[in-house]
Amino acid sequence: IAVIKSSELFDLLELNKINLLNSEFYNSQNGQAIIALSIKLMLEELHDNPTETTLKRCVDFGHSFSPLVEMYSIEKDGVEVIPHGIAVGNDCVITSIISNNRGFLSTKNLKRIVELAEFIDFRKNHYLHQSAEVMWSSFADMTKHRGGKQNLPIPTSIGIYDFIQDLKYSELELAISQNIK
């Protein structure tokens, strides 16, 4: 939610990135601030749409290309299961690359997003993250759940977002190729 909705939260994550994977950190003042702000932001989004009657939601950021990737890693691979956070993290990076390719997100902000994702190990490249076919199938399924509209939330800056309705398969392929490390 930091990338899409709160530059303040993103800044806190960046400043404290060394400690983010240490569970003890969340007892500290900065750790508590990160948790409190995350909860507040999520509740703000859910408050006005508790029954999900509005299908254009920024909280879908990270949940467009990743659902099938995550499920296939369990069902088809079984060897290297992709945890939810890593699947979502990769989805966020791919979506941010798409936004940058379209000229909405600056290269500087894309770099910040990618660097933070890499630092906290949310950018592991499982072979399923390199499959445009699997990711596009996931996106097609999510589009159905969004009333037949893509409603793809993209960051236009850190903490600012918009939606696109016309993503093409070739754009996803390009973003995936740019994400392979």
Each model region followed by its residue ranges:
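Carboxylate- and glycine-rich phosphate/diphosphate-binding segment that chelates Mg2+/Mn2+
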Residues: 1-59
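Alpha-helical transmembrane segments of multipass membrane proteins
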Residues: 44-45, 68, 98
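A short glycine/serine-rich beta->alpha loop
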Residues: 51-54, 76-83
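Small-residue-rich helix-loop
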Residues: 86-94
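C-terminal charged capping/lid subdomain of soluble metabolic enzymes
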Residues: 104-181
